[in-house]
């Protein structure tokens, strides 16, 4: 995960001080890309411990089309708590857009099922895309999508994915995002009888919050360790039938966790 540490250093060296929606303040760069060959290991940051339980449960929650935090709470995941209303609702965020994008004539498009069908039946298509950025529903969302748009690509029997993330909290959010989409690529590849290829991450406003500077310097002082390996223990009937216990991370030996405040 040297690419991640290099990005941190780049933001420190080249970032512009900017104000932001949360009022915290950031150092920010615009436009950055990283590529992770998923054959080389599972891209889970090792210079601090990442909470893999939260990453897996959040992705399963997205794939169910759920937008209420009840499922997350049942599984001791609190990463969405700050944005939920008194009933636990978040509005039409990721899960809704992935699984039930509304059309003007009253139908709903299941984008995940659509891309699975494309991967199986038309893998050379240049339209194998999922978007969470629904302009017509942004004002109803508790938080506008940060990881907004992703595309799949098949070559030589391998499945790759590129994500465009319009806004990226490099210290807290990005390790989650990389691991989450890498996990999704593994799941989609298994469902389509493909090998995993690359995960390509592309960032827009890529920033470090001003109250994450000490934590960033601490993390940069640590030497990355070997990447772990993801094991998927079974192949479910569909992408929507995976369970938390289907996944195992082998060989994850990170440095200790580093706490930091969330900008709301």
UniProtKB/Swiss-Prot annotation:
Transmembrane segments: none annotated. Pathway: Pyrimidine metabolism; dTTP biosynthesis. It is found in: Cytoplasm. (6R)-5,10-methylene-5,6,7,8-tetrahydrofolate binds at residues 51, 169, 263. Its main location: cytoplasm. DUMP binds at residues 21, 126-127, 166-169, 177, 207-209. One of its GO terms (molecular function) is thymidylate synthase activity. Its EC number is 2.1.1.45. It catalyses: dUMP + (6R)-5,10-methylene-5,6,7,8-tetrahydrofolate = 7,8-dihydrofolate + dTMP. The active site is at residue 146. GO terms for cellular component: cytosol. It comes from the Bacteria. CDD domains: TS_Pyrimidine_HMase. SUPFAM superfamilies: Thymidylate synthase/dCMP hydroxymethylase. InterPro entries: Thymidate_synth/dCMP_Mease (IPR045097), Thymidate_synth/dCMP_Mease_dom (IPR023451), Thymidate_synth/dCMP_Mease_sf (IPR036926), Thymidylate_synthase (IPR000398), Thymidylate_synthase_AS (IPR020940). PROSITE patterns: THYMIDYLATE_SYNTHASE. Catalyzes the reductive methylation of 2'-deoxyuridine-5'-monophosphate (dUMP) to 2'-deoxythymidine-5'-monophosphate (dTMP) while utilizing 5,10-methylenetetrahydrofolate (mTHF) as the methyl donor and reductant in the reaction, yielding dihydrofolate (DHF) as a by-product. This enzymatic reaction provides an intracellular de novo source of dTMP, an essential precursor for DNA biosynthesis. Homodimer. This is Thymidylate synthase. The lineage of its organism: Bacteria, Pseudomonadati, Pseudomonadota, Gammaproteobacteria, Enterobacterales. The gene is thyA.
């Amino acid at each position: 995960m040297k690419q991640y540490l290099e990005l941190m250093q780049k933001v420190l060296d080249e970032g512009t001080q900017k104000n932001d929606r949360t009022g915290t303040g950031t150092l920010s760069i615009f436009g950055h890309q990283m590529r992770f060959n998923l054959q080389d290991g599972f891209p889970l940051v090792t210079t601090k411990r990442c909470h893999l339980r939260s990453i897996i449960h959040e992705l399963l929650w997205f794939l169910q089309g759920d937008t209420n935090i009840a499922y997350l709470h049942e599984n001791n995941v609190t990463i969405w708590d700050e944005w939920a209303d008194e009933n636990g609702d978040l509005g039409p965020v990721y899960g809704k857009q992935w699984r039930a994008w509304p059309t003007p004539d009253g139908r709903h498009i299941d984008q995940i099922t659509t891309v699975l069908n494309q991967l199986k039946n038309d893998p050379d298509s240049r339209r194998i895309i999922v978007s969470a950025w629904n302009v017509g529903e942004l004002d109803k969302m508790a938080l506008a999508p940060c990881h907004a748009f992703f595309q799949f690509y098949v070559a030589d029997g391998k499945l790759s994915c590129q994500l465009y993330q319009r806004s990226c909290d490099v210290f807290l959010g990005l390790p989650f995002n990389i691991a989450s989409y890498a996990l999704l690529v593994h799941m989609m590849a298994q469902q389509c009888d493909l090998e995993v290829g690359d995960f390509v991450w592309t960032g827009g406003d890529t920033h470090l919050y001003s109250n994450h500077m000490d934590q960033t310097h601490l993390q940069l002082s640590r030497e990355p360790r070997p990447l772990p390996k993801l094991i998927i223990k079974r192949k479910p009937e569909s992408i929507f039938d995976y369970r938390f216990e289907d996944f195992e991370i082998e060989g994850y030996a990170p440095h200790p966790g580093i706490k930091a405040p969330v900008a709301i």
